Design a protein with these regions (language model features):
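Active-site cofactor/cluster-binding pocket
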Residues: 1-194
Length: 194
C-alpha cells in the first residue's frame, strides 16, 4: 500500500492502557527519522483504563497544516476487537484503504461483525493475532508492539528498520535489553506474517 494522498493518515482504536499512544509515537518518530513530517496525538476523555480511545497519526513529505482529528484515514488499526461492537471503525475508509485488526477472527468473520453494525468495507482487511504473538514471545499482552510489524508490512509508510530503531531508542532503557529484544522479535514476527 502506497500513499495515495499528500498526507498519509492513520487512526488507532484501542482501550486505555493498550499502548495505542506509544505505537503512534513509535511510528511518528520512525517517520521523522526518515525525514518526513508527522503529527501524532490521542483523543480520549477523563475515562479510566479500559475505556475506548482514538489516536491519530499523519505522515507527509510536506509540512502538515491541519490540526483536526483524522476523519479520512488511509489505515485504521484496531488493537481491541471488542471495539468493533461499539464503533464504526470503517467510516470514511474506501476500497483503496486498509483495516488492521488484532483478532483471531478470519477476514470473513470481521466482515460479518462489521455488517452487524451496518458497516460495509470493501478495502483490505488484515487480521493478526497480536495478543497471541505477544504472549508467545514477550509473555505479556502487548498488542501495540506486535501491530507495529503488521502496520509496516501493510503500509510501507515507514521502514521496519526505522520502527525497530525507534522502539529500541524509546524503550530499551525503560524495559531492559532482554524485554526490548523480545518485543523487537514480536514486531519482526508480525512483519513476516501472512
Amino acid at each position: 500500500m502506497k500513499y495515495h494522498k499528500d498526507i498519509f493518515e492513520i487512526i488507532f482504536y484501542a482501550r486505555g492502557g493498550q499502548g495505542a499512544k506509544a505505537a503512534a509515537e513509535i511510528i511518528a518518530q520512525a517517520a521523522v527519522a526518515e525525514g518526513k513530517f508527522v503529527q501524532a496525538f490521542p483523543q480520549f476523555g477523563p475515562e479510566r483504563s479500559g475505556a475506548p480511545t482514538k489516536t491519530f497519526v499523519r505522515i507527509s513529505e510536506k509540512a502538515i497544516r491541519t490540526y483536526e482529528p483524522v476523519i479520512d484515514p488511509d489505515v485504521v488499526v484496531v488493537l481491541d476487537e471488542t471495539i468493533l461492537d461499539s464503533e464504526v471503525v470503517t467510516k470514511n475508509l474506501d476500497s483503496q484503504e486498509a483495516l488492521i485488526v488484532n483478532t483471531k477472527k478470519t477476514i470473513h468473520e470481521i466482515q460479518q461483525k462489521l455488517a452487524e453494525h451496518g458497516a460495509r468495507f470493501e478495502g483490505k482487511i488484515y487480521p493478526i493475532d497480536a495478543n497471541g504473538i505477544s504472549m508467545e514471545i514477550v509473555g505479556q499482552p502487548r498488542p501495540n508492539t506486535v501491530i507495529l510489524g503488521k502496520f509496516v508490512q501493510v503500509t510501507e509508510a515507514v521502514s521496519l528498520a526505522s520502527v525497530i530503531a525507534e522502539f529500541k531508542h524509546i524503550f530499551e532503557d525503560k524495559i531492559g535489553k532482554e524485554a526490548n529484544d523480545k518485543n523487537i522479535l514480536a514486531i519482526e514476527k508480525a512483519y513476516d506474517s501472512i
